[in-house]
Amino acid sequence: MSGRVTARRRVVRLTPAGEIRRQDTLAVEEPLEIRIGGQSLTVTMRTPGSDIDLVHGFLLSENMIGAAEDVVSARYCAGTDEQGRNTYNVLDVELRRPVPVRTRHVLTTGACGLCGKTALDEVRAVTRFPLPAHGVTLAADVLADLPATLRAGQSVFQATGGLHAAGLFTVDGTPLAVREDIGRHNAVDKVIGWALRENRVPAHELVLIVSGRASFELVQKAVMAGIPILGAVSAPSSLAVDLAEEAGLTLVGFLRGETMNVYSGAHRLRSVSAGTRTA
């Protein structure tokens, strides 16, 4: 599977000095069809690798499972490319308890037909792991260092410049799992799936860091896994902030260097400075 994460392609690089023809390294993007008991559930475009974790995280986010033991088996189905090699692009999952399967059963795609308020109500209603109002806290200086630790684990991004990343950390800054993917939601599903399979869900004492922006979908996935703190290198969306406030999640954006914007749940962060001012 590791050989399928990157691919080499010819590229013409245009520079002020002229054309340079060379090989370039690209991140692989392939479809993964998820089936439940042989019935197609959804197809996601992903970077191959950690597919079992991805599926566990996705099913948890969709409230189809709540623990690792809810999955009896997950196996690749037969499927070959033009060279006769297994594509490893179809995963069939057997669940311990039957659940209704609707094709493309998702809470968080643009095609799901949910308005913002309805989406908030549905996520709040179905989460199995409500976030505790108090409990874990995180030092702001520790949080500020986590994006650099995340980048250090992005080996494929360093080779391609084309992948998102997500990481789970302890509140003292120890990295537990870092995953990369062409889709930021897949990267989050991969680390959440890892946590589920390691019996660390609900993840009430962990921190989720993502390499890009914080969308509603990523906040929803954090809430469904019981993660109390989500930090993003870029901006959150308005709906992401709405959901974070509703769920009691600490949402931090523009996490760059020593500065950051805390959009909700500031009570979980311990500042190194006692000074506070309003702009």
UniProtKB/Swiss-Prot annotation:
Database matches in InterPro entries: Cytidine_deaminase-like (IPR016193), FdhD (IPR003786)
Keyword Cell membrane: no
Keyword Cytoplasm (UniProt): yes
Cellular component, GO, one term: cytoplasm
Compartments in which it is found: Cytoplasm
GO molecular function, one term: sulfur carrier activity
GO biological process, one term: Mo-molybdopterin cofactor biosynthetic process
Active site, UniProt feature: 112
Pfam families attached to this UniProt entry: FdhD-NarQ
Domain of life: Bacteria
Main location: cytoplasm
Keywords in alphabetical order: Cytoplasm, Molybdenum cofactor biosynthesis
NCBIfam families: fdhD_narQ, PRK00724.1-2
Family: Belongs to the FdhD family.
Function, as annotated: Required for formate dehydrogenase (FDH) activity. Acts as a sulfur carrier protein that transfers sulfur from IscS to the molybdenum cofactor prior to its insertion into FDH.
Record-given protein name: Sulfur carrier protein FdhD
Species: Nocardia farcinica (strain IFM 10152)
